[in-house]
Amino acid sequence: MIAIPCMDTMPTLFVSSLVLMDKMPETEMAFAVSSLIYDARNTIAASALRNNFDRLLWIDSDMKFDRDMMKRMAQRMDEGYRFVTGVYCMRKPPYAPVLYKAFEPGIDPMPFSKGELDPGKGMIQIAGCGFGAVMMDVSILSEMKNQRSDYPFSPFLGLGEDLSFCKRATEMGVKLYCDTSIRLGHVGLQEFRL
């Protein structure tokens, strides 16, 4: 399932990427509209569990990506990875990568440097990431539901919903990875890219 949480409108660069994307056979899409992104993510997560999907591809509505992104992430999942993201940056200076070596609630996360994310590095383990483009095994949500009483994307104090999810997942022993060869643009008034 392709999971797209959004607030209201979607930039043309995102829509064109989505339309042109090489989709896997029988792929469904779920849009959840909410002014609270964590609520939209929790709604889609519950639907994925209820409908017995195997994988979720989260794509934020402000991302621009290559048409083969889904297939490349699926290939990594087929290799045994349960959580895969790509490389993109924040939309404001200093345009830091939205990939973290370490983070704790209330403390600024420690991002990877651009040099550490060279496309030739391939797969690297991360502590957390933004959810602009993440493919994950739905079994992670199932395990989380069985081990915790809170919603998977409910934000911890001092963390967004994406890093809060990553914290929950890593506390359960889930390993998170970034494929540094998968590059995305983050769309604002212009496209931002590393």
Feature map (PLM): residue ranges:
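Conserved catalytic core of nucleotide-sugar-dependent glycosyltransferases
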Residues: 45, 66-154
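Active-site nucleotide-sugar/metal-binding loop of Leloir-type enzymes
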Residues: 42-55
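Short, Asp-centered acidic motifs that coordinate Mg2+ and/or phosphate
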Residues: 55, 81-83, 176
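Residue-level recognition of beta-strand->loop/alpha-helix junctions
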Residues: 30-33, 87, 180
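Anion (oxyanion) recognition and catalysis
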Residues: 23, 78, 170
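Short beta-strand-to-loop acidic/aromatic patch adjacent to the donor-nucleotide binding site
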Residues: 53-64
